[in-house]
Amino acid sequence: QKWSGILDLRPKTVYMSFGTFARAHMMPAEYKNTIRNAARAFPDVTFIWKYEKPEHNASQGIPNLIESTWVPQNDLLRDSRLSLFVTHCGQGSTTEANYAGVPLVVVPVIFDQVRNAFQVKKNGLGVILNKAELEKSHAFENAIREVLHNPEYKQRAVAAAAMLNEKPFTAREIFVHNMEFLAKHGPLRQLDHYGRKLTFIQYYLIDVIAVVALSIILVLSIVIY
C-alpha cells in the first residue's frame, strides 16, 4: 500500500538506484546535487531514490523526491505507473527492467555495465549518461526529459518485454528435450571441443611467449652491446 500510494502521487514516477556497488550515499556532493536539482526541475514527477543513509536528509525540502533505504525493485518495475528507471545498468537491474518493459536512463560505472549500457542504447530502450556528466544538472535533466517525453522509448521497451516474456519453450522443456536427444544418440564426438585436449604449454601459449621473450632479449642484447 505504501508504494502504491507513492506511485499515485503524480502522473509520472522515476525510480533511481545505482546498485550495491555504487551506493548513493557515497556519491560526490555534486552528483547528489544534480539528482536533487532534477527533482526540482520536474515538480510534476515523483522521484524515488534508493538512498542508504536516511540521516543525511538527502531529500529535505523537495516534496517530490522520496528516499528509501530499501525498495521492492522488481515489483516497482512491473507496475505500469512507473515511467522511468535510472540505473547503473548492472546485469540484474537491466534484465529486470527489460522484462518489465521500463525505459531507462543508464549511468554505467564499471565492468559489464558499459556493455549493458551499449545494448540499451543500441536497442533504443533508453539513453546513456556518462557518470562524469552527473556533475552537470542540465545533462541529467535532458536525459530524463528525453525518455519521459519521447514515447518511442516506452514503446520499444514494451515490445522487447513482450518478446522476452513469450518464450517458445520453457526451461524444463528444453532440458527434457536435450536429455532425450542425448539418450537417443549418445555422446557426440562432433561436439567434443578440441580445446580441452590441449597441453599445458599449448593452452597458455607458453611456446609463443617464450619465442617473443627470447626475441626481445636478443634485440636488447644487440642494441646494448
Language-model-derived ranges and their functions:
Residues 45, 64-66, 82, 126:
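Short, conserved active-site loop motifs that form the nucleotide-linked donor/cofactor pocket
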Residues 1-61, 71:
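Conserved catalytic-core segment of nucleotide-activated headgroup transferases in glycan assembly
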Residues 55-64, 77, 96-97:
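Short loop/helix-cap segments at secondary-structure boundaries that form the rim of catalytic
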Residues 35, 47, 76, 86, ...:
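Hydrophobic, well-ordered secondary-structure elements that form the walls
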Residues 69-117:
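A donor-sugar binding/catalytic signature common to diverse glycosyltransferases
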